C-alpha cells in the first residue's frame, strides 16, 4: 500500500455497527464504508523537538533515552499510561543478552547486548525486579541465559530513566497522523485529553510495533499476518517450587534456569514442561486454549507469565478482528486458571493478578527498509560494514541456531525506512523473512535496535542531515561510547 492510498483511507470515517462486533474494515483495507463525515480544518498548537519517538515499548524506551542522552531535545509518544510494551505484556523473559554458547562446547560465553539495555537490568537488580542473567541448566539449546523481570517494576524503572534523561514523555497519547513535506516528515499529530497537537522534529523513530508512523508517512509496507495472536497473564497465590515438582514427577521438564528470586540466588526463575508427558486432562485442555507450560518469575508465589496462543487470522490494524480475538483470549485466560487449580499442587487457590491491556501479535505491518535481513544472514552469523547491533538469539532454536553459537549483525541500513528521508524504525516491524524475524523481533534485539536508532536520530538532528547522509563512523563512535558491543 502506498502513501496516497493510506492517506485517503485514514481521512474517511465510516459509520460503524450499532451493536456487537463491527463488520466494516478499518483504514487501509478493502470494502470501505460509503458514508463519510468530513472533518473541518482547525489550527493545532505546535511543539518543536529534535527527535520524536513514536511508541514507548520495548524499542521506544531505549530509543528515546539514547536520543536524549545524545543531547537531542526528545519527545516520546506512547498510547498507554506506561512504557515497556511487549517486555511487560507478552514476553516470558528477555531474550537474549548472550550468545548460545552452552549449546556449543568450547564456544566462549560473551554478553553481546550491553549499553542501555544492560543498564535497565542493573537498575532492576537493585530493586529486586529481575532474576539477573540466569544460566539455563536445561533447555540451553534454546537459550543459554534467561533474564526474567518483574513487569511492574520494569515500567517504573524505565519511566524514571526517561525522565532522568530529559525526555518529554507523553503517555496516554495517541499518534494520529504525519505531516509530510514531500518525502520528509515535518511533524506528527498526537491526541490526548489535553487536546490535539502537532509535534515538529528533525528526525523521527517508529517504535510503534505495528508501523503506525511509517504508514502515516507513506512508507511501503505489507501485512504478512503470519503469527498467532498471543496474550499472557500473571498468576498469583501459587508455588513455583511445587509446579517444578509437578513437572518433574511426570519427567516433563524441558527448560530450567536458576537465578535471583525473592531476594535469594540459585532459585528457579524459568521452567517449562513437555506438555505431551503431562496428565491427559491437563494436556488436552491446554492444547485447546493454546496454553504453554513455560513460566518465569522473580517471586516465590507468582507466575509472571502464563502464555496463551490463538490461531485465528487477525490483523492488528483491523479493530473488529482484534475485538473478537480479545474476547476469545479472555475466555482462555479463565480456563487456564481452572487447569492450574485442578491439576497443579500449590495452585489450588490461584487467581489472575495481571492481564495485558491488549493482545499481542508478533508482527503487524512489515515496513520496507533500505535492507532486508535474510535468514541466511542470521544463521550464517553475517556481520556488515554498518553494523549497529550484535545479536545471538533465535526463537526457533534448536531447529534454527546461529552458526557455531555465534552472532550476527543488524546493519544501520536495515533500520532506515525506505522512501522517507528522516525516519528510522526499530522493533518487530522490520525483517520480511519469517524465519529471520523469529530472531530480530525478540525483546533484547528490539532494545538494541532502539539504542541504535535513537542515537542515529539524535546525530541526524544535530547535523541537520537525513538518515542516509549520516556518517557511519560517527554513529559507531557514539554507540561505542554508549556501551554498545561490536564483534566486527
Please state what every model-predicted region is.
Residues 5-27:
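N-terminal export signals
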Residues 33-48:
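A short, basic/flexible loop-to-alpha-helix module at the beginning of a structural domain
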Residues 60:
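N-terminal Rossmann-fold NAD(P) dinucleotide-binding loop
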Residues 46-57:
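Beta1/beta-strand and adjacent pyrophosphate-binding region of the FAD-binding site
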Residues 38, 42, 86-88, 128, ...:
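Flavin (FAD/FMN)-binding glycine-rich loop and adjacent Rossmann-like elements that form
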Residues 66, 72-73, 79-177, 181:
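Conserved N-terminal/central alpha/beta ligand/cofactor-binding core
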Residues 52-54, 63, 183:
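Membrane-embedded transmembrane-helix bundle of lipid-linked glycan/lipid transferases
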Amino acid at each position: 500500500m502506498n502513501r496516497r492510498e493510506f492517506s485517503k483511507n485514514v481521512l474517511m470515517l465510516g459509520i460503524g455497527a450499532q451493536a456487537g462486533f463491527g463488520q466494516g474494515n478499518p483504514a487501509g483495507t478493502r470494502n470501505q464504508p460509503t458514508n463519510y463525515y468530513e472533518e473541518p480544518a482547525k489550527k493545532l498548537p505546535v511543539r518543536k523537538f529534535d527527535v520524536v519517538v513514536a511508541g514507548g515499548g520495548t524499542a521506544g524506551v531505549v530509543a528515546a533515552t539514547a536520543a536524549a542522552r545524545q543531547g537531542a531535545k526528545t519527545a516520546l509518544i506512547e498510547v498507554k499510561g506506561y512504557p515497556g510494551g511487549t517486555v511487560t505484556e507478552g514476553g516470558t523473559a528477555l531474550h537474549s543478552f548472550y550468545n548460545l554458547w552452552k549449546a556449543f562446547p568450547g564456544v566462549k560465553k560473551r554478553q553481546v547486548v550491553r549499553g542501555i539495555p544492560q543498564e535497565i537490568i542493573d537498575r532492576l537488580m537493585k530493586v529486586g525486579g529481575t532474576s539477573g542473567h540466569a544460566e539455563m541448566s536445561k533447555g540451553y539449546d534454546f537459550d543459554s541465559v534467561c533474564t526474567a523481570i518483574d513487569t511492574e517494576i520494569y515500567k517504573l524503572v524505565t519511566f524514571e530513566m526517561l525522565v532522568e534523561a530529559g525526555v518529554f514523555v507523553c503517555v496516554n497519547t495517541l499518534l494520529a497522523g504525519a505531516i509530510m513535506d514531500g518525502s520528509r516528515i515535518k511533524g506528527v499529530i498526537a491526541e490526548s485529553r489535553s487536546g490535539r497537537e502537532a509535534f515538529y522534529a528533525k528526525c523521527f523513530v517508529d517504535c510503534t510495533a505495528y508501523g503506525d508512523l511509517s504508514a502515516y508517512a507513506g512508507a511501503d509496507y505489507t501485512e504478512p499476518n503470519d503469527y498467532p495472536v498471543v496474550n499472557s497473564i500473571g498468576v498469583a497465590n501459587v508455588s513455583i517450587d511445587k509446579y517444578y515438582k509437578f513437572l518433574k514427577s511426570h519427567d516433563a521438564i524441558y527448560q530450567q534456569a536458576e537465578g535471583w528470586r525473592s531476594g535469594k540466588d540459585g532459585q528457579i526463575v524459568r521452567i517449562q514442561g513437555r506438555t505431551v508427558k503431562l496428565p491427559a486432562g491437563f494436556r488436552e485442555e491446554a492444547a485447546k486454549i493454546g496454553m504453554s507450560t513455560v513460566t518465569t518469575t522473580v517471586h516465590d508465589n507468582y507466575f509472571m507469565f502464563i502464555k496463551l496462543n490463538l490461531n485465528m487470522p487477525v490483523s492488528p490494524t483491523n479493530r473488529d478482528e482484534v475485538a473478537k480475538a480479545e474476547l476469545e483470549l479472555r475466555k482462555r485466560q479463565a480456563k487456564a486458571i481452572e487447569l492450574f487449580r485442578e491439576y497443579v499442587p500449590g495452585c489450588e487457590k490461584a487467581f489472575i493478578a495481571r492481564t495485558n491491556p491488549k493482545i499481542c501479535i508478533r508482527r503487524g505491518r512489515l515496513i520496507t527498509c533500505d535492507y532486508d535481513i535474510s535468514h541466511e544472514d542470521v544463521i550464517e552469523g553475517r556481520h556488515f560494514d554498518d553494523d549497529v547491533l550484535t545479536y545471538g538469539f533465535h526463537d526457533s532454536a534448536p531447529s534454527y541456531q546461529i552458526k557455531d553459537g555465534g552472532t550476527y549483525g543488524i546493519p544501520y541500513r536495515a533500520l532506515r525506512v525506505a522512501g522517507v528521508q528522516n525516519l528510522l524504525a526499530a522493533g518487530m516491524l522490520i525483517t520480511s523473512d519469517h524465519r529471520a524475524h523469529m530472531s530480530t523481533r525478540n525483546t533484547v534485539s528490539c532494545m538494541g535496535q532502539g539504542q541504535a536508532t535513537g542515537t542515529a536520530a539524535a546525530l541526524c538532528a544535530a547535523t541537520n542531515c537525513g538518515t542516509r547522509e549520516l556518517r557511519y563512523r560517527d554513529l559507531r563512535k557514539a554507540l561505542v561510547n554508549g556501551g554498545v558491543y561490536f564483534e566486527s
